[in-house]
Amino acid sequence: YKKDDLLFEFASEEKATLFGISAKYIDALNNRKVVPKNNHDLSKLRTICSTGSPLSEDGFRYVYNNIKKDVHLASISGGTDIVSCFVLGNLFQPVNVGEIQNRGLGMDVDVFDEKGLSIKNIKGELVCKKPFPSMPVKFWNDDGNKKYKSAYFEKYNNVWNHGDFAKITDNEGFIIF
């Protein structure tokens, strides 16, 4: 199992249409000059989801140049704590290099400045302004919800602060830093 593109071998053999990989794996393949499209039949592959960390602009370009030109690339951002995505891909919108396309279903996601004001095209805090379907309601053994409130609601009153820096673009896409 020392092959850099082993996961693409599995995707090819299984005729995968949806393939999830990490941004770090994409970066590693790029750095090692691996070209999966040359060695694997990825004709069935329609969507690649990238997660784990922000996908760089170079990572976007690598996917389209070396994996598959006509794939839908969906970088996503969320967390295990919410069992969901705050922002993710959307098959009905164009993919813009370096951007995550859309807010997740049921997610009132925004970017705030230090004062708690909504900002655009400026790096700020990724927040969710309203409760969402998979929002945890407490931490185990957290008397009075002190740790829970401190983790997510201390900075902005009654607004979930996820602890990630982000920017909303002119395309209404998101860049996660």
Predicted regions and their residues:
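Conserved AMP-binding/adenylation subdomain of ANL enzymes
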Residues: 1-17, 32
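Gly/Ser/Thr-rich phosphate-binding loop
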Residues: 16-21, 30-95
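Alpha-helix/helix-capping structural signal
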Residues: 24-27, 134
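Short beta-strand-to-turn element immediately C-terminal to the catalytic PLP-Schiff-base lysine
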Residues: 86-90, 112-113, 141
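Short, P/G- and charge-enriched loop/turn segments at secondary-structure junctions
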Residues: 93-99, 150-154
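Short coil-to-beta-strand transition motifs
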Residues: 100-106, 160
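Hydrophobic beta-strand positions
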Residues: 110-111, 167
